[in-house]
C-alpha cells in the first residue's frame, strides 16, 4: 500500500497518462514539479529530481546519473545517457523522490522514475489504437500510429503486443543552395535539395 511507505512517492495511472497525452520522456518530466529533464539531444537526456545533479562534464570520474530510469524492473540509465522512450500502453509511472540507493543502487541518489507497462490479462480480449497527424507550414507532415492488443491464450496464459510507427516531419529549410569554399574553390551544389 502506497500509504504505508515512508518515502515520497507519486504514482500516475493509465487514465491520467492518456488524459495528459504523455508520449515521451518530456511528458513524464511534466508530471511532477520535482523533476527536471535536461534534453541534451537524441539518446542523451538526463533526469534530475529535486535539483540533484551529477556534476556533468565537470565530474572527472564520469557523470553517473543521479536519477535512475526503470522500464518495469529493468534499469535503463547509463553513464550520461537515458534512452529515448516512446511511452505507450503504460499501466503507471511511479516517481520516487529522495535517495533510493539502498533499494535500487548507486544511480538513485536523487530518486527513481519507474515506467510500468501493462501486463497480459487472461480474462479479456482488449485492443485499441491511436492516430496522430500534423503539419508545419512549409514542412513535411508528422504522423504516428500506435496500437496494442491483449489476447487470452487459455485459462492461464495471455499475450499482449504493443507497437508504434512515428515520423517527425522536418521544418528546417536548406536555404543555401550552393557553397563555394574560398581557399580551395571547391563548390558544393545542393540546389536539388534546397
Where are these regions (language model features)?
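N-terminal periplasmic "start-of-domain" segments of outer-membrane beta-barrel proteins
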Residues: 1-20, 45-48, 67
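A general structural signal for stabilizing positions within well-ordered secondary structure
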Residues: 19, 26-29, 84, 103, ...
Amino acid at each position: 500500500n502506497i500509504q504505508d511507505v515512508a518515502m515520497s512517492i507519486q504514482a500516475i495511472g493509465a487514465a491520467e497518462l492518456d488524459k495528459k497525452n504523455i508520449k515521451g520522456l518530456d511528458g513524464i518530466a511534466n508530471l511532477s514539479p520535482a523533476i527536471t529533464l535536461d534534453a541534451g539531444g537524441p539518446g542523451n537526456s538526463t533526469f534530475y529530481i529535486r535539483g540533484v545533479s551529477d556534476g556533468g562534464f565537470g565530474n572527472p570520474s564520469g557523470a553517473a546519473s543521479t536519477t535512475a530510469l526503470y522500464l518495469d524492473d529493468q534499469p535503463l540509465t547509463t553513464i550520461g545517457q537515458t534512452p529515448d522512450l516512446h511511452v505507450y500502453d503504460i499501466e503507471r509511472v511511479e516517481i520516487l523522490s529522495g535517495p533510493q540507493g539502498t533499494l535500487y543502487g548507486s544511480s538513485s541518489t536523487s530518486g527513481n522514475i519507474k515506467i510500468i507497462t501493462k501486463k497480459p490479462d487472461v480474462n479479456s480480449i482488449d485492443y485499441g489504437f491511436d492516430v496522430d497527424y500534423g503539419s508545419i507550414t512549409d514542412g513535411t507532415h508528422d504522423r504516428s500510429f500506435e496500437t496494442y492488443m491483449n489476447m487470452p491464450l487459455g485459462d492461464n496464459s495471455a499475450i499482449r503486443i504493443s507497437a508504434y510507427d512515428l515520423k517527425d516531419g522536418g521544418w528546417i529549410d536548406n536555404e543555401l543552395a550552393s557553397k563555394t569554399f574560398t581557399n580551395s574553390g571547391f563548390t558544393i551544389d545542393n540546389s536539388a535539395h534546397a
